[in-house]
Amino acid sequence: MRLEKHASSLVDYTQPLSFVFNNKAYKGFKGDTLASALIANDVLYYARSFKYGRKRGIIGAGVEEPNALVSLEIGGRYTPNMKATEIMLYDGLSAVSSSNPHSIDFRAMIKPLHRFMPAGFYYKTFIKQKVWSIVEDRLRSLSGFSKAPSVTDEDVYDHIFQHTEVLVIGGGVAGMSAALEVLSGSKVARVILVDERENLGGELTNEFTTDQTATLWFQEAKGKLQKYRDEDNSRLKILTSATAYAWYDHNYIEVLQTYGTGQSMIHESGQNARKVLHKIRTKEVILATGAHERPMLFETNDLANIMLSQSVRRYIN
């Protein structure tokens, strides 16, 4: 089900896309994530829990999503354990759940034994026994994760060395404001702005449907950043779909930027890098990473259609 389109929607309803999930064809639009497209197609279940085999739905809308792990594409472009909430939809996408929620639940047969199987029981029960080599593969197959790739990766990867005065990690309101403050306060300082999402704005984008002030502020701030880039692109670099994952001594930080899945880039001219590792040396670091909402604790809070309030607002937008 789709909501009525609004002016600030991140989804372009003029560009329909076709994709396949768990061997079934669906329709989505440019700007959708795989998760948002599946929700719009009334898909409820994406996985089963490890211990009890309970069907799981989507809880989050980004990196915080614990359930919707999928295997993307096949052959040399096969990628395991990707989160449906982080995959931007493209025409011809093909994905399957890491643990099929619609398969027969063989784990139901061992439910009466659950009281004898506390977390980590297999390490004490089997690790010193000769049977470990027999049961290990079976136990790991129940874990709900994708199979490891079995063929050579066809994609191209690259790395870049970068130097800057200020590195801002987080492209929401705080991060954009910090970058603008540095740029306006110095005529020579270089800034790199990093955000994990495809678009800047962070949680502010969740307010566009109801808060005109948020929309106006974002458009103005984005325009100022673009002006700095146009005037001197060496002073401001914006890395979207990028994760700062390591901070070493002397402010050496590694950022992994994803340009797309291998299959989504297959029609581009040349053989472009699918992922680029930015090796950044910076004088100062500003952390503007925001926070994740904690789920509420109550009985059956793992049922499908129970989401974080942040996630609901994000899918609406």
Regions found by a protein language model. Give the residues of each.
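Signature of N-terminal electron-transfer/Fe-S-associated modules in redox systems
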Residues: M1-G144, V276
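FAD-binding core/adjacent interface of flavoenzyme oxidoreductases
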Residues: G53-G57, L93-L167, K187, F218, ...
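N-terminal Rossmann-like FAD-binding beta1-loop-alpha1 element of flavoenzymes
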Residues: I160-I192
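Short glycine/serine/threonine-rich phosphate/pyrophosphate-binding segments
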Residues: A174-L180, E203, I306-S309
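Short beta-strand to alpha-helix junction loop
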Residues: T210-K224
